[in-house]
Amino acid sequence: MAQHAVYFPDAFLTQMREAMPSTLSFDEFISACQRPLRRSIRINTLKISVADFLALIAPYGWSLTPIPWCHEGFWIERDDEEALPLGSTAEHLSGLFYIQEASSMLPVAALFADDNHPQRVMDMAAAPGSKTTQIAARMGNRGAILANEFSASRVKVLHANISRCGIANTALTHFDGRVFGAALPEMFDAILLDAPCSGEGVVRKDPDALKNWSPESNLDIAATQRELLNSAFHALRPGGTLVYSTCTLNRQENEEVCLWLKETYADAVEFLPLGDLFPDADRALTPEGFLHVFPQIYDCEGFFVARLRKMSSLPAMPAPGYKVGAFPFTPLKGREALHVTQAANAVGLLWDENLHLWQREKEVWLFPAEIESLIGKVRFSRLGIKLAESHNKGYRWQHEATIALACPTHAHAFELSVQEAEEWYRGRDIYPQTPPAADDVLVTFQHQPLGLAKRIGARIKNSYPRELVRDGKLFTGNS
């Protein structure tokens, strides 16, 4: 694999020599940093099993190598990347997989280690959504995830990825993560803090990542990380699990931040060793039980992961100063709820007791039950999934609800051919040789829901959202 020129400040190299254990070669570190990063994907098991996905893509000639810490993760090599980018494949568009760097799958693996089954989880710095969607898959779309993102522009990307992957158990917030310890004290069974960092581990993806690097900026970032970790620890319930991770390599932003928490709260903090997380994990193990992944160890991005347990309750932080405001939704119950449920079921949209119906004017939403105790304590950017808009003739079912809830074996399901699916993704109506009998059609491809549509005579009217419409080649092996 070709080398590429990476910019290394001298002070960074000095720091890495000091941080790297004697068992590792510094020359191999430099060599690994100069190799382009291997691409990797994570199969979305909310949509398809690993075995079924591998069978589906077998004819494509993709070379997949298992990632040892993530059963559904694979390094991928393809010959047709220029003709058809991985992100434009039909399997990606329908949410069957997520393009995710291998080492970034480690934090969620750590969060769910030792048969941990949290019901309410916070992803404190969630965009673009790789870890949120990985958490949702591990939870089987049950329970609830509060996915927070400080950057307003990245909240939109986060929602788009959650929607594409068919996730229904998530609430989105847009806050500085430092508010949660005070706003939601001891409310979460598990928290992932993938902290903002200096990004020293990403030079294989971005050779200029260290252009603005300095030891002083690392210390400033570490101060922010301590504040975020303190907030996360207060928001965690006693007995809960917290994973702290970064994509950087210096000790100040990694081990020292975690040791600061231990020094501050002493017996309330228990470090949970990660040496048994996967075969060969001990190659990256620190004396504290953390994983400090230098890029040459597993041929991936540099990364750091620590897991800890909260052993006892803490005194409350000062109450937050913001006002939440009136909640604009009301629960939908009784006859109205039954009517909506029956109408949705009739077109193939199904859900269980984990999701509850709420209403705002003519909008009908589904919220995860586990999130309801947080209502009134924090403002949500988006909560659950929008199911429908009501009108005089019934309901206008929403695309994100179809992707998350539709049953592809429903009587109204209509499986498209490859050519018809290409037309669908391009926003065009479908003219099947044998039109479906029903007026309301659940359009599927590869037995995955693509949308709900109306049959008008012999034509299926396209309902694919305009902002998602694609042009160009979409299907592997199809010219």
Curated annotation (Swiss-Prot):
Belongs to the class I-like SAM-binding methyltransferase superfamily. RsmB/NOP family. It is an enzyme of class 2 (transferase). Specifically methylates the cytosine at position 1407 (m5C1407) of 16S rRNA. It catalyses: cytidine(1407) in 16S rRNA + S-adenosyl-L-methionine = 5-methylcytidine(1407) in 16S rRNA + S-adenosyl-L-homocysteine + H(+). This is Ribosomal RNA small subunit methyltransferase F. Disulfide bonds: none annotated. It is found in: Cytoplasm. GO terms for biological process: rRNA base methylation. It comes from the Bacteria. Keywords: Cytoplasm, Methyltransferase, RNA-binding, rRNA processing, S-adenosyl-L-methionine, Transferase. S-adenosyl-L-methionine binds at A125, A126, A127, P128, G129, S130, K131, E149, D176, D194. InterPro entries: Methyltr_RsmF_N (IPR031341), MeTrfase_RsmB-F_NOP2_cat (IPR049560), MeTrfase_RsmB-F_NOP2_dom (IPR001678), Nol1_Nop2_Fmu_2 (IPR027391), Nop2p (IPR011023), RCMT (IPR023267), rRNA_ssu_MeTfrase_F (IPR023545), RsmB/NOL1/NOP2-like_CS (IPR018314). The active site is at C247. GO terms for cellular component: cytoplasm. Gene3D superfamilies: 3.10.450.720, Vaccinia Virus protein VP39. GO terms for molecular function: RNA binding; rRNA (cytosine-C5-)-methyltransferase activity. Its EC number is 2.1.1.178. The keyword Methyltransferase applies. It holds the Pfam family Methyltr_RsmF_N.
